[in-house]
Amino acid sequence: CNGSGFDRFSAATGVGYEDLATWEGFYDAAGKFYDWSGKPFCALDYPIRAVELCAMEHGSGDFYTENGWYDTGNAVFKESWMQFARSLAQGHVVVSDLYSNTQVMTGDVLSGLGSSAAILYYNDTVTYRDGTQEPMDLRVLPMPKTAGVDALMTQAGVGLCAYKTTAQKAEAAALFVRWLTENERNLDFVAQTGYMPVRNGAFDDIETYDKFPEPVESYQQLYAALKTMRENDTPVSEPRFEGYYGKVTALYDGLRQLQQELPARAAAGEDVDALAEETWALLCSIQ
C-alpha cells in the first residue's frame, strides 16, 4: 500500500489499516476511497483466489467441477464472487494490468493485492501521472479474511526438481536442496526475494533477523505479516486442473474489458447488482 497516500485518506475519512483486516472492511474501505478520490482503491493480481478463499471461509465446500472450473450452482461461491464483483462494477477495485505494483507506483490505485514477492518490484517513490512525486512509504499487511471464522491463506510456490540421471548427480541434487534450505541460509535467501521460508526454524528467526534489504521497514512488515498468517491461517493449495490457468487468463482478460465500462454505467444509475451479474455471466461462459 502507498503509505503516503493512505495517510491522507485516513486523515480525511477515519479509515485505518486495521479496517483492512477483513474482506468486509476491505471492500467498505475501497468504496470510501473511491468516493473520496474518484480512483480505485486496490488492484488485485489474483482476484479469483481471493474469491475462493472467502467462499471457503464461509463454508462453501467443494466448488470445483470435473472439468476443472467452478460449480456455478454453489450459492456461497457465487455470493463471494458477487461481493468482489459489486466492488469492481463501481470502480472501487480493479483487476491489475498484470502485476499491481506498477499501478501503485504510478498512483493509479492506492494499494495492490498479490504475491509477497512483489516487494522486489516496488520503487521508493510514487510518480503520479502529472509528474509529481512523493515517498512510497510502502506498507505491507496480511491478506484480508472473513470476520469471525478461521482464516485461510493461499499456498503457492516454486518447486525444485532434478531430471532422472545418474546416482551421483541425484545425490548431488539432494545435497544442494538440503544446503539451500538450511535454516539460516534459507532465511537469507528468502529475505532477498520476498518468499516465505520453508523451514520452521527459519520462520522462528524472523523476529530477530537483521539483514533485510532496503527498505528495511517494509521487509520487516512483510515478514511480520507472513509470520502472522503462518501462525493463524490454514494454507490452501491452488487448483492444479489441466487447462485451469488458461481459463483464468480468459476470465481476467474479460474482466479487464468490463471494468473499463461498468463504473461509468453504475454512475449513470444502472443497478449495481445487475452490472455485477454481467461479470458472473462471464465466469459462467468459460468452459
Language-model features: locations:
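Conserved C-terminal helix/tail region of periplasmic/extracytoplasmic solute-binding proteins
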Residues: 214, 220, 224-287
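Short, solvent-exposed loop/beta-turn-alpha elements that line the ligand-binding surface or hinge
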Residues: 16-19, 61-79, 130-132, 145-151, ...
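Aromatic-glycine-rich donor-binding/catalytic loop that engages nucleotide-sugar donors
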Residues: 4-18, 90
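Glycine-centered hinge/linker elements that transmit conformational signals in sensory
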Residues: 27-34, 66-97, 138, 143
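Extracytoplasmic/periplasmic substrate-recognition and gating elements
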Residues: 85-92, 129-201
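Paired acidic/hydrophobic, glycine-rich loop segments that form the ligand-binding mouth/hinge
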Residues: 110-115, 120-122
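Extracytoplasmic/periplasmic solute-binding protein
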Residues: 7, 23-70
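Short helices/loops that flank or line small-molecule/ion binding pockets
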Residues: 28-32, 98-112, 253, 257-260
